[in-house]
Structure formats: C-alpha cells, structure tokens
C-alpha cells in the first residue's frame, strides 16, 4: 500500500424506501444510490465530509478497487495525511442520480415495465441530485456535515447544498464552478448532445439490447475534453508533434498527437459511460441557476456555511470571474467566504491534478476551526433582576451549567454557574449580585478553538459566552465541544 493510500475499498448501495420527488414534479420509485465511505464516523457524527463528483465521475473517489490499475478520481486529496484526512474525517461520496455508475439512471430498469428507462426516465436537476444525497445521509444517521466539497459539476452541487440546506452544513468548498451555467457552457453541452443523438445507433435512446451509440458518445467526450484542457497544457503536452510519423500524410487521416489523444479519450470513455446518462446530466448542468429574479445576491442570501471558493487561472470553461461573482454575492450577504486561485496550466482539469496546491489550500481551510464552528447558538440568558431561585429553575429546566446575564440590549453583564447557585443556597444569598461574576472572560466567533481552549484551561473554567463586536451575547462554547473537536481535528 502506498503512503497515504486507503487500500482496497468497495462500493455500497442504498435503496430508498420511498419515492424520490423531483424538481419537475415527477417521481422515481425504487431508487438506488451507489456510494463509498472512507474513515470512521465518530461517536458524535460531526466529522462528516461529503464529496460531490463532476460530470462523468462516480462514487469511487479514493482507494483501489480489486483489479484496477489506478485509484479513485480524487485519491490525491483523500486518505491518511491528505487534506481530506481519513484519520480525522468520515468521507462519503455517492454517484448522482441520472448517472450510470451504480445509481438509478436512464440505463436502470423501470420497475413498471421491466425494461431500461431510456428516455422515459424523468429529467433531473442538480437540486434533485442533492436531495438524493440528503436521503443517503439521513439513512446513515447523519444530521449535519462538517463540510461539503466538489469541483466542476461537483462544485455546483456544493453551492446547491449551501442554498437548499443552509443549517445542515458547516463549511462549503466549491472548485472550478459557477452559480449558474453560462451560454457558452450550455452551447458546448448542446453540441455534445447533438453528437450523441445524431448517431444512428442511438435509436431515440432505445439501444440497450443492441449497440450503444459509441461513435456519438466518443465525439461528445472529445468535445468536452477540449474544454477541460487549456491552450498552455495542450502546447506543453502535444505541441505540433506528429503521431507515429515524421512527415505529413497529406490526406484526411490523423497526423498530430493531439488528434490521437482525443480519439483515445473518446473511445475509452464509451467503455465506462452510458450515452443517455450523458444527455441527462449535461441537461441538469444547463438548468443550474442559483440566481433569484436575476440576482445572485438574492439567490445566495440564505447561505450560512463558511465558504471556500477556488478557481483555476487557466480554466476557460469555468473562468475565475465566475468564481469571483460568487464571492462578491456572498460578501454582500455577510457570508464568511475565502477566495483562492490555483496557479496552473492544466485548465479546468487542474482541480483533479494539482495535488500540492489543493492539499495546502483545502487543508488550511478545513483545519482553521473557529469558535463559530461549534458554539451553541440558542443560548439562554437572563437579566440581573431575576431571583436566585428563578435562575436555578431556568438552569435546571434547560440542563445548563452556565447562565450569561445580560442588559436590556443583550450586552454581557456577567455570568453565573451551577456552582454559584450551590454557593448561594449554602450561604442563603437571595440576590443575584452576591454570586454574579462581572469580569466575564468571553470569546469571539472568529477566535480559534485552540486559543479558546487555552483561555479556559488557564482560568480553570468550562464555558465561555461568545459575544459580537457590540458585546452582545450570540452563543456559548463549552469545553466538552472543544475537546471533541480538537480530538477530531488535531493539527498535522
């Protein structure tokens, strides 16, 4: 086993018990979701990272399948000691619905007919993919995820997750993505679809008992693959080098290495992918649009997750300006967002190739855990005029040991603890001021949890009120939450 490798992994399958309702209003029954999971789910189930794959990806994101000659598609990032560290995190990746790598799609058997769906399969959207993933996580008993990450179409899913389930995710990492599909992106997808449906073997999608439209699918892949590269990468890799010859043939056969490469990519793709799935998934990408009434700011207004938006300098399919548009909209909504550009000549595919930069940027973002990541938001507070008896009752009813005392405008005035209440009972104190700690040690939401932990340890206290810049109480953080998180995310 190579250093940092997961070794042999297996794909698992979850069968939904209920129908899956789609954005179009239609429903799919007997839905299967193929997925893989790496690492160990901790006792509190708060170390989950969901990985979302790109257009033609699958659930096999890392490790090796028996007999394979290469690992999963994001093995450079997933495994022990990598940024998606399986010694810290429980990583889940599933094949999208509409796909052909284990999850229900047009090549699956329609339970009503006993035959492959073909074009009777309903059109799906990125939102439908995300909703299916949510069903899987519910099945796994996961009530929240630490982070969701993906590149290209995976990045679209990340953004959709952030909008659809804002209270469910803590951090969101979108690579080489956009908040809506541009006319150019839609145009490339349409040309690819025409390549498929123009193949006589396509037969209106009814080819499952004959031959797949391999010529059309290969051509679609060739078109797509050009958009994944960059001019620089093609010049570096191929230049104008000839393939197996030292002079032009002066005919219409392949002369150049780049031609041979594209044909190879097209042929090999037909061995692992279904033509109808390509039609459906590219259509889902075309429909993707998170703007609301034309406004991206309005469309992203509900996002609560801390966001990392990553672009690639040489990506012309999802150019950096589209990522910057996302960042500006998030900033306008006061979302905590970080923007990074990967310096690379690989083009769009850099999110699959630039191991060093990606591990550094993503690892730094995931390990930069602050108080706001784990503090309790629904903090119970009281004012100074409350009686000790009432304060004790509130603490008992809510199962808490620390009770911040605030002014009329919610500013911190002090704090009392269960130990203070015990002291008041023993000494027969009747007013809160006899036990109130007024010089309160507090924390800020952007404070690192290790600094917060040292503050608690140095002062021998087990919880801190969290205040904003106006000294208003916005949460509380306890040593138990910190100990759990530090244990799961120890710095490397």
From Swiss-Prot:
Substrate binds at residues 221, 349. Its main location: cytoplasm. Its EC number is 2.3.1.31. Residues 47-354 form the AB hydrolase-1 domain. The active site is at 152 (nucleophile), 315, 348. GO terms for biological process: homoserine metabolic process; methionine biosynthetic process. Belongs to the AB hydrolase superfamily. MetX family. GO terms for molecular function: homoserine O-acetyltransferase activity. Disulfide bonds: none annotated. It comes from Methanosalsum zhilinae (strain DSM 4017 / NBRC 107636 / OCM 62 / WeN5) (Methanohalophilus zhilinae). GO terms for cellular component: cytoplasm. Homodimer. InterPro entries: AB_hydrolase_1, AB_hydrolase_fold, CBS_dom, CBS_dom_sf, HAT_MetX-like. The keyword Iron does not apply. Keywords: Acyltransferase, Amino-acid biosynthesis, CBS domain, Cytoplasm, Methionine biosynthesis, Repeat, Transferase. It is an enzyme of class 2 (transferase). This is Homoserine O-acetyltransferase. Residues 375-432, 436-492 form the CBS domain. Pathway: Amino-acid biosynthesis; L-methionine biosynthesis via de novo pathway; O-acetyl-L-homoserine from L-homoserine: step 1/1.
């Amino acid at each position: 086993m190579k250093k940092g490798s997961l070794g042999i992994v297996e794909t698992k399958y979850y069968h939904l018990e209920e129908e899956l309702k789609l954005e179009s209003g239609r429903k799919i029954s007997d839905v299967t979701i193929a997925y893989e999971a790496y690492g160990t789910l901790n006792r509190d189930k708060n170390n989950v990272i969901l990985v979302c794959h790109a257009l033609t990806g699958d659930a096999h994101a890392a490790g090796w399948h028996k007999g394979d000659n290469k690992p999963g598609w994001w093995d450079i990032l997933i495994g022990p000691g990598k940024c998606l560290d399986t010694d810290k995190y429980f990583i889940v990746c599933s094949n999208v619905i509409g796909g052909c790598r284990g999850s229900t799609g047009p090549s699956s058997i329609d339970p009503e007919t006993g035959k492959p769906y073909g074009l009777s399969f309903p059109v799906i959207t990125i939102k439908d993919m995300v909703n299916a993933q949510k069903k899987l996580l519910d099945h796994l008993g996961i009530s929240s995820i630490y982070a969701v990450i993906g590149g290209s179409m995976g990045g679209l899913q990340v953004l959709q997750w952030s909008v659809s389930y804002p209270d469910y995710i803590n951090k969101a990492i979108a690579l080489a993505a956009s908040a809506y599909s541009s006319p150019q992106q839609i145009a490339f997808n349409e040309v690819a679809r025409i390549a498929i449906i123009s193949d006589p073997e396509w037969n209106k999608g009814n080819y499952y008992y004959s031959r797949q439209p391999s010529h059309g699918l290969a051509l679609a892949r060739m078109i797509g693959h050009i958009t994944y590269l960059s001019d620089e990468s093609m010049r570096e890799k191929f230049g104008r080098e000839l393939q197996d010859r030292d002079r032009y043939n002066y005919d219409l056969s392949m002369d150049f290495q780049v031609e041979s490469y594209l044909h190879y990519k097209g042929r090999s793709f037909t061995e692992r992918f279904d033509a109808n799935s390509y039609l459906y998934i590219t259509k889902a990408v075309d429909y993707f649009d998170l703007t609301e009434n034309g406004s991206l700011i309005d469309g992203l207004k509900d996002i609560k997750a801390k966001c990392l938006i990553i672009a690639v300098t040489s990506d012309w399919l999802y150019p950096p300006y589209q990522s910057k548009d996302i960042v500006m909209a998030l900033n306008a909504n006061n979302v905590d967002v970080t923007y990074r550009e990967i310096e690379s000549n690989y083009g769009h595919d850099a999110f699959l190739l630039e191991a060093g930069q990606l591990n550094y940027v993503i690892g730094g973002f995931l390990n930069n855990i602050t108080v706001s990541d784990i503090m309790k938001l629904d903090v119970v507070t009281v004012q100074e005029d409350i009686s000790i008896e009432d304060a004790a009752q509130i603490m008992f009813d809510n199962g808490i040991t620390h009770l911040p005392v605030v002014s009329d405008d919610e500013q911190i005035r002090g704090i009392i603890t269960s130990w203070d209440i015990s002291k008041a009972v023993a000494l027969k104190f009747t007013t809160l001021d006899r036990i109130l700690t007024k010089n309160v040690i507090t924390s800020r939401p952007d404070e690192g949890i290790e600094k917060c932990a040292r503050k608690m340890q140095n002062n021998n206290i087990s919880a801190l009120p969290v205040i904003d810049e106006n000294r208003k109480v916005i949460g509380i953080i306890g040593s138990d939450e910190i100990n759990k998180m530090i244990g799961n995310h120890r710095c490397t």
